[in-house]
């Protein structure tokens, strides 16, 4: 694990007025950060974007002291304070609530007690199967106003992909009333399963394929419980990611209705469990899955099966924070170029054996999130420092959002409660999860083919002898799995560019191998740790590239647009008054 950095005295760490270097004037109260920092700010960094400066910031943000940057926790919120203090040190002005660097995000943590909770399926012969928590199922409730949430025995219905998409002529829920019933749902969408380009978007996952949508739609249909069947290829991650991500404290925004509109129970079940349930109902899982891929699929009652459940939970109202900073433009300061990255990760899961025996990380309970997303947050700070050294026409807006790991909640909150009008944000760039694999010949654009920002990226890459590459795994739905989507839904043109895949040392095969190894061994696990042997040369070049794209827009009068026909084009036109 990373060694904890030595703590300074409290007096040295309290920022009532920051003391930045000579190149960055002090940011005065009320925008100052009046909190004690758990870890010191860097002694000196430079406006040049360098691997050395990135390493300092990544290492600090991924340090054990911040305990995995869990939103609402003292250590997690201390990491947000550190980011704000670093923005102040760099000379960026506060852009949050009441002249501060913070936008408060009211949240609630809900923690299931597996020992007293249950999810029970009754077979046709009357025998009960209580699904093993983590071995067969992981479940929770989004209802926030009760320590115990139950649903009575009810029918179980297979609803295919659980999609209602009029634009695709698709309705998996047609013809039934789902009140009091448990729905069983496939992950992803029919386009992925079949590879048929005429279904949805073919191999590229749509939002209808996301687990978030599945549970939202089940609630709209009035279901008592919603169970998504986990399959590694379709989900793009293994069952260990499910057990690591959806157990322990689960965060949500405070909802006006206390979550009453959601199903009583939401969860994942293993494919093996699903196969057992289908067999008991006299159905073949593989055959039913194939049927769900065809237009005109009708939901299937799983004859003789009943499901009931009880979730006992602790509920803890908390508050987290988005960190917001701005570097004002000189000519049109009311127009903004946005950079985003999420600062949060999964926090601590005390007492869990999350590694493999013999590894240093065995029984480590801190999910440090070095790649995910200390890298993106470090890049946000690095670009802010570089922008401060420039004379910009437009303002540069930096938002480090919370609660990404809980379903993009911090960015969704900001998009609903923006600190600047969203129709004054000219364009945005999101940074999330860069792998330290060295120099590459390309950069991957997630959701490629979306906006004119890609043309600008392509031009910058050409000056480096590099190229742009479409997402090699569109079936994983990464375009809908990071914070740019919250702004895109509001019409803001967004670019989400990851590091490249074609390594200078080793080619595409080496790049694919590195990505696969990270997903298998480190993603959403305590093993996502910083190491001093990371090769950040490629990350340095990528962040220089994203800085240049944003800087050039901030020094121009151009308004990049979505490509014609893009799903977010209409929202942008509406926000701009039909322009």
Residue ranges: model-predicted function:
Residues 381, 385, 389, 503-571:
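His/Asp/Glu-rich mid-to-C-terminal helical/loop segments that flank catalytic regions of hydrolases
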Residues 122-125, 134-175, 259-369, 382-385:
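Soluble metallo-hydrolase cores and metallopeptidase-like ectodomains found primarily
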Residues 203, 234, 347-453, 564:
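Acidic/histidine-rich catalytic neighborhood of metal-dependent amide-processing enzymes
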Residues 67-197, 301-303, 311, 315, ...:
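Noncatalytic luminal/extracellular "stalk/propeptide" segments of secretory-pathway proteins
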Residues 22-97, 328, 563, 579:
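N-terminal hydrophobic or amphipathic helices/low-complexity stretches enriched
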Residues 159-240, 334:
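A conserved hydrophobic secondary-structure block that centers on an alpha-helix together
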Residues 15-17:
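C-terminal motif of bacterial Sec signal peptides marking the signal peptidase cleavage site
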